[in-house]
């Protein structure tokens, strides 16, 4: 009887530890740089979006990094960033190809998603 009780308790503890130890992991946004400057070569303003993202399991698990910019009128601009280096995801766009205006205030949402559907998001703002 003692052996059966010990076995049952050990199975219960094992099940509880296995279930309680699983912690879903998600990407981790740890740096953001957004800038706008005039580029004489293109005769236009250039927007530079840079986001540094890590993943606790593997960097290759990061599927996408997106930036959403909202102006004071509620208009939204969206950019899908590309990986460029170990942690860096970035995009460089000409202002004429966007509805952005250098010097305006923008609320910014950044979302990093991995292949398992877990996300990290960061909210910030831009004002030149």
Where are these regions (language model features)?
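Extracellular acidic, Ser/Thr/Pro-rich low-complexity tracts
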Residues: 50-59, 114
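Sec-dependent bacterial lipoprotein signal peptides
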Residues: 1-21
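Surface-exposed, short loops/turns at beta-strand junctions within beta-sandwich domains
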Residues: 96-105
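Proline/serine/threonine-rich low-complexity linkers at boundaries of modular beta-sandwich domains
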Residues: 21-31
């Amino acid at each position: 009887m003692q052996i059966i009780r010990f076995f049952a308790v050990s199975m219960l503890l094992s099940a509880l530890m296995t279930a309680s130890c699983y912690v879903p992991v998600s990407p981790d946004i740890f740096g953001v740089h957004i800038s706008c400057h005039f580029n004489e070569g293109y005769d236009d303003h250039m927007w530079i979006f840079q986001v540094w993202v890590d993943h606790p399991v593997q960097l290759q698990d990061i599927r996408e990094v997106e930036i959403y910019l909202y102006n004071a009128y509620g208009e939204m601009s969206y950019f899908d960033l590309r990986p460029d280096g170990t942690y860096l995801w970035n995009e460089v766009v000409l202002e004429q190809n966007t509805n952005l205006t250098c010097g305006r205030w923008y609320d910014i949402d950044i979302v990093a998603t991995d292949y398992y559907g877990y996300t990290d998001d960061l909210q910030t703002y831009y004002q030149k």
